[in-house]
Amino acid sequence: RSQDPALSDNNSWDAQNGDCSKGWNINNRSDCLAQTGSPKWTPGNHNTWNGCVVDRGNPTGPSALNTDTNVLATDITKNDTLFAAEQYGACPQAVMPLSYSWAGMKSLVNAMSPNGNTNQGIGLAHGWMSLVGGGPYPAPPAEDPNYKYTKVIILLTDGLNTQNRWYTDQSKIDTRQATTCANIKAAGITLYTVQVNTGGDPTSTLLQQCASDSTKFFLLTSANQMVATFQQIGTNLSNLRIAQ
C-alpha cells in the first residue's frame, strides 16, 4: 500500500485517483475535464486499493555512515495514515502459482506485453518463490514420501540485464542475480537458462554460470528455436524421471 502524504484530504486524493470517461490513460481530474465532449471524472473508492505488490527496491546497504534501521509498522491511529490509499493503475501481469491448468498458463502468457528493460533476477526470484511457497505465494502441494521429486526452474530471457528499477547498473544486477542462482542451486533446485539472442548481444556469461551445468544453458539466435529447446528440456526431465 503506497500513500502520498501530500494527498492528506479526500478532495486532493479524488483529483488524482479515479477514472475518466474519455480514456483509461487520462489519470487525473484536471486533464480529464479539459477534454472535449462532456467528460466525466469518477473518483476512486476510498475503501479499496487497486495497486499491486511487487519486488522491493535495492536501497543503500548499512555502513559506518549509513547504519541499519528498524522500520516500525505503520501506526494506523495517526491521521496521516488514515486517508485513502494512493491508487496505481499500471500493475504488471500477476505471477501464476504452480498449476496444472495449461489453458490458464497459456492465457496468462498471451496476455503479457513486452515493456521496459530487462532484469532477469526479479523473474528468477519470483519463480523460486512460486516453486517453494512463502510470502504471497501458496505452499506447494504436499509431496508423497514414497517418491523423489525434482524441482526445476527454467529462466528464459531475450536480453541481458539492463535495468534496476529507476537506474541502469548492469554489474550490480548481475552480482545479485549470481547470488540468487547460487542459493537456488544450493537448495537442490535444477536451473536451466535460455538466452534468446536475436539482437547481437554477447553470449551471457552470467546465464552460463547460473545454469546447473553446461548442458542446461541454451543459446538461441531465433525465436523459432524455442519450441525445440523446450522439447529437449522436457525430454531430459522425462529421462531423469525414468532413470530414477
Question: Model-derived features: where do they sit?
Answer:
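P/S/T/G-enriched low-complexity
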Residues: 1-244
